[in-house]
């Protein structure tokens, strides 16, 4: 598979680079990295691997852009400075969502525009918790499992989003921390 011309130079600089994520009218406009052997390598490193408290956006090791996963899970810090994924919190406001229904995630192989289907706050669960774990979904075994994931996300959203997803659609999940 050929790498898009617009990303070839970035990929030559760092083979961990897998794409670019941006959301209009936010500070979210960053490269996305992935390291198969060390999922959190970029949690406190910049694009070049140097220390950075903000880190760089990175995809979960269970996500794949080569054989596209049903869901690509991308992590980023919620920086008080407004950088990285801080502006995801704007989706708590329905008016913001209504004016920003689309997210651009281009991989090194192709461009992708994703329509927002859910926006919510949750927590990382303890082992014994039986609650919905959005961060464990990558590939659905069947339509039922896919629909269960989408329904779980929509149920946590504080306002109504009419957009639906169907089995076979490609999803991205953007995940950050709250403080």
Task: Report residues per predicted region.
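Solvent-exposed, non-transmembrane regions of membrane-associated and secreted proteins
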Residues: 1-179
């Amino acid at each position: 598979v050929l790498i898009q011309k617009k990303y070839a130079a970035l990929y030559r600089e760092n083979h961990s680079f897998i794409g670019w994520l941006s959301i209009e009218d936010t500070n979210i406009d960053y490269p996305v990295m992935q390291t198969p052997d060390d999922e959190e390598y970029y949690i406190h490193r910049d694009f070049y691997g140097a220390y950075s408290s903000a880190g760089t956006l990175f995809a979960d090791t269970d996500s794949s852009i080569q054989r596209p996963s049903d869901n690509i899970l991308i992590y980023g810090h919620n920086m008080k400075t407004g950088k990285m994924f801080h502006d995801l919190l704007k989706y708590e406001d329905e008016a913001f969502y209504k004016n920003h229904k689309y997210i651009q995630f281009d991989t090194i192989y192709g461009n992708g525009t994703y329509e927002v289907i859910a926006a919510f706050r949750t927590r990382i669960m303890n082992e014994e918790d039986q609650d919905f774990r959005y961060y464990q979904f990558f590939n659905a075994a069947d339509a039922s499992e896919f629909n269960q994931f989408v329904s779980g996300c929509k149920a946590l959203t504080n306002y109504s989003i009419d957009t639906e997803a169907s089995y076979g659609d490609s999803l991205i999940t953007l995940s950050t921390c709250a403080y």
